[in-house]
Amino acid sequence: MSISDNSREELGELPAGRPLQSEFNDDLDYPRLGSVTFRRGTLTENQQTMWNEKWPELGRVLEDELIDIDAWFGRTGAKTIVEIGSGTGTSTAAMAPLEADTNIIAVELYKPGLAKLMGAVVRGGIDNIRMVRGDGIEVLNRMFADGSLDGVRIFFPDPWPKARHNKRRIIQSGPLNLIAKKLKPGGVLHVATDHADYAEWINELVEVEPLLEYKGWPWPECPQLTDRQVITKFEGKGLDKDHTINEYLWQKKQ
């Protein structure tokens, strides 16, 4: 049964209240959102007009149905990369024109962030970006078949800095295993953070998933674009505080 219905009166809206969460029974650690609900926000009048016109073509919301990637993008055989937590889409929109042969699917909870990305897509005539509104773990688990993705990107995820909230971090054993299952052999996971404690956390996990081979950073032979092209809003804030950007690359074993 579908969690969402894109035909609802307000396009791209998610159910109110606490989001549904999958039950994982593999003894791995998965983030739990706890009291966090789907982030809501107000669009400008122009953004709302654009959203109403373009969302049926460019967007979907979290649902229990696998995405037919070829049908959605109107082409077959193209590589597909999912970006989890795309924010306002600064990197997404900057990278996509340089990888026109690749389908880019941006996953984000925050509606104004997706609207901003949609504006960049429309203004720039970018035709290889689509959007899914929902929690990244649930979207991966419910909407993509195993072995269907060429890449997953997670740029500057929420660090959940308080120790009692560390279990909500997306980079941990469970998500790494889930991502590995969704990647094709040879597929790439690219993570970036400017949070020192989160970087230490990730450093302890780089070898935890047996399906992934850690390649470090940089990895000149990486088969995908790794230059994020621009400094994102959150990256800029970190650099202003003299934070170090740490990046990580893994490849699914053949």
Curated annotation (Swiss-Prot):
Name the pathway.
tRNA modification; N(7)-methylguanine-tRNA biosynthesis
Domain of life of the source: Bacteria
Which reaction is the catalytic activity of this chain? guanosine(46) in tRNA + S-adenosyl-L-methionine = N(7)-methylguanosine(46) in tRNA + S-adenosyl-L-homocysteine
> Which residues are involved in binding substrate?
162, 194, 232-235
Location of region: Disordered? 1-25
Instruction: Please provide, alphabetically and separated by semicolons, the GO molecular function terms listed in this UniProt record.
Output: tRNA (guanine(46)-N7)-methyltransferase activity
The protein's matches in InterPro entries, at most eight in alphabetical order, are given as: SAM-dependent_MTases_sf, tRNA_(Gua-N-7)_MeTrfase_Trmb, tRNA_methyltr_TrmB_bact
Spell out the SUPFAM superfamilies in the cross-references: S-adenosyl-L-methionine-dependent methyltransferases
Active site, renumbered: 158
Point to the regions of Basic and acidic residues compositional bias: 1-11
> Where is the stretch described as Interaction with RNA?
164-169
Tell me which GO cellular component terms the UniProt record holds.
Answer: tRNA methyltransferase complex
Q: Per UniProt, which keywords does this protein have?
A: Methyltransferase, S-adenosyl-L-methionine, Transferase, tRNA processing
| EC code | 2.1.1.33
UniProt-listed CDD domains: AdoMet_MTases
Binding annotation for S-adenosyl-L-methionine: 83, 108, 135, 158
Can you tell me where the transmembrane regions are?
A: none
Name the Pfam families for this protein: Methyltransf_4 (PF02390)
Q: What family does the Swiss-Prot or TrEMBL record give for this protein? A: Belongs to the class I-like SAM-binding methyltransferase superfamily. TrmB family.
So what does this one do? Answer: Catalyzes the formation of N(7)-methylguanine at position 46 (m7G46) in tRNA.
Protein name (database record): tRNA (guanine-N(7)-)-methyltransferase
Give the gene that encodes this protein: trmB
